Amino acid sequence: MNFKNLSIKRRIVYTVEGFADRLFTPKYNPFYYLGTICAFLLVLIAISGLYLFFFYRTSSPYETMQSITVNQWYLGGIMRSIHRYASDGLIVFLILHLLREFLLGRYRHWRWVSWVSGNALLLTSILVGIIGYFLVWDERAQMIAIKTAHLLDDIPVFIEPPPRTFLSIATMSKMLFFVLLLAHVMISMLGMGILTGIHVSRNARPSVKPPKAIAVTVLVILILISLITPATNALPVSMTKVPVDVPFDWFYLFIYPLASILPKGMFWAVAVGGTIILFIAPWIGRPKRQPTAQISPEKCVGCEQCHKDCPYEAIKMVPRKDGRPYLFQAEVISGSCASCGTCVGACGSNAPSLPNRTMEQIEEEITKLLYLSRKENGRASIVGLVCEKSVNQREFIDIKNSSIKGMPNVSVVTFPCAGMINHSVIEHAIESGADGVFVAGCQTGECSFREGSKWAQARL
């Protein structure tokens, strides 16, 4: 059995989430719904952005946004503010989501697609946000244009040096703002939509909606902020002077102070190098992957239950070729398999198995532990079927006799995930002499393999 202590990174996450559990209750702990909150914010951004799109005019960007904010303060102004603050919130929750998955180690092996697409979504969001600020064409937009032009000055692809281009009123044409508006809309709607689809593509039944209470709370907070501190224009652009003191959004524009502090070569090295490391993190020092699940065709009856329960769509049904009287048989997609054992718990004919943790080994272990417990303690024995990721095993489990510390009559058998447990395991424990059986898995929203606790509860 695997008796490893929790890493420092996991301790950080569980400490923060434990505090949030006490504050919000586990059912409404926002840290369990970071991804779905991001999806909800994207919906709010799309709705408010669509409203602004109908009123935006590329011939007079500043005047348009000023009119929406002032003349329509009761609706247009609120929509603009929600668009702004929901976008800020998106960056915050994307970073929290990525940071949580990194600290929990949930970005390697079969999860690399979600990690890479998630980082791409973060960078794309920042790009879209910067373009959005440009579309207002106030002093803040002018500063962004100048700073961006200076960053691009070393790239030899421009006929005219970028800083001079952005400082020329002649280049600030209606066509330029049309192109920027098109880029803002297309990248946000099409690009981010595709990335979001890729992000959840390997998850069965992806969760994209937060609990109603959390969604309502987020919306109310955004509306209150919009009323208390509405998003407004900075001063109009003046081509005769360079803007100095302008309102600043650190969530999107943080790269510009960083570029001002660091030498240009070092800035590009940090930016490009950091981005590359972020994207290749799943392959840096990753631990050995656990053997993936295997299917015994002779036991498979084509019921599709393992295919339906798999949290990562790592099992597909293929036509049978062995002449048995079933249309299909299950087949594991190794690259997507998490080795969680959910398919093992789903099957009534024992067709799936984990090479390093078979049901035969588990049943033999249960029988042995119950025999030794009865022999040594001479009293009732209880068996705990425990997800190895749901507890700090070194803290709670006595390694020598596989029991809970201070409770020698409570034997513990660990599983890769609670989703591997089904009624047959419990029946075996009872038939082997257990006076009681309990199952311990991850709490709601916290399952390392997404749906283990859900399936364990449903099967029992």
Task: For each feature predicted by the language model, list its residue ranges.
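Membrane-embedded alpha-helical bundles of multi-pass integral membrane proteins
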Residues: R10-V13, F19, L23-F54, E63-H83, ...
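Short Cys/His-rich zinc-binding micro-motifs
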Residues: E298-C300, C337
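Active/binding-pocket-proximal capping segment
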Residues: V244-P247, K316-P319, G323, S402-S403
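Iron-sulfur cluster-binding cysteine motifs and their immediate structural context
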Residues: Q305-A338, T342-E365
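Cytochrome P450 catalytic domain signature, combining two hallmark sequence patches
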Residues: T58-S60
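Iron-sulfur-associated redox domains of electron-transfer enzymes in respiratory
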Residues: Y133, I144-K147, I221, M359-L460
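Membrane-interfacial segments at transmembrane helix termini in multi-pass membrane proteins
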Residues: R286-E298, S353-K368
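Membrane-proximal soluble regions of multi-pass membrane proteins
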Residues: M1-Y14, A314-V318
